[in-house]
Every structure is written in C-alpha cells, then in structure tokens.
C-alpha cells in the first residue's frame, strides 16, 4: 500500500472509532454525570406505573435546582419536573411511608 493510502485508511478508522464511541448514548436518558445539573430538560408527564425508582437530588453546589430522576422498569432514566403537583404528592407519600417504617 502506498503511504498516502495508508494514512487515509488510518484516518478513516480513527474517525469511525470516534463516531462509535460518542454515539452510544440512547435518547431520553440522563446525560450528565459531572458536578453540574444532570437534568438538562424534564418530561412533563410519565406513566407512574412504569417507574421502578425515584432519585431526588436537592439543590447544592453542583446544581441550584432540585432534580428528580426516575428509573423506569425498562432501565431508562428520565428527568421529571419537581414542580409537577402529582409528582410532589407521590414524593410526600414516599417520605411519609419511609418515616413510618
């Protein structure tokens, strides 16, 4: 193989590897895991029967907002609006049942 062809092939392989490494994130999942807000946008509604668990992260130095991340039964993580009245009622019920246990 001629040197220019080998360089072109190496560049193409490198580009392919970079694309594969960066395109693996499924849509609708929580993206950030660093010291910043994890919820870039929230879903207005979710079928609560599909929720496996909820994680509530209070405001702190990493993010000034309360974040609610729901893990769905299919393993997908989605951000929910912490101001939604139905979600607030569910969180209050969970907190009350946790205190009585």
UniProtKB/Swiss-Prot annotation:
One of its GO terms (cellular component) is extracellular space. InterPro entries: Chemokine_b/g/d (IPR039809), Chemokine_CXC (IPR001089), Chemokine_CXC_CS (IPR018048), Chemokine_IL8-like_dom (IPR001811), CXC_Chemokine_domain (IPR033899), Interleukin_8-like_sf (IPR036048). GO terms for biological process: cellular response to lipopolysaccharide; immune response; inflammatory response; neutrophil chemotaxis; positive regulation of cytosolic calcium ion concentration; response to lipopolysaccharide. Transmembrane segments: none annotated. Disulfide bonds join 37-63, 39-79. It is found in: Secreted. Residues 1-32 form the signal peptide. Keywords: Chemotaxis, Cytokine, Disulfide bond, Inflammatory response, Secreted, Signal. The keyword Signal applies. Gene3D superfamilies: 2.40.50.40. GO terms for molecular function: chemokine activity. Induction: By lipopolysaccharide. Expression increases until 4 hours after treatment and then gradually decreases, remaining high 24 hours after stimulation. Ligand for CXCR2. Has chemotactic activity for neutrophils. May play a role in inflammation and exert its effects on endothelial cells in an autocrine fashion. Belongs to the intercrine alpha (chemokine CxC) family. This is C-X-C motif chemokine 3. It comes from Rattus norvegicus (Rat).
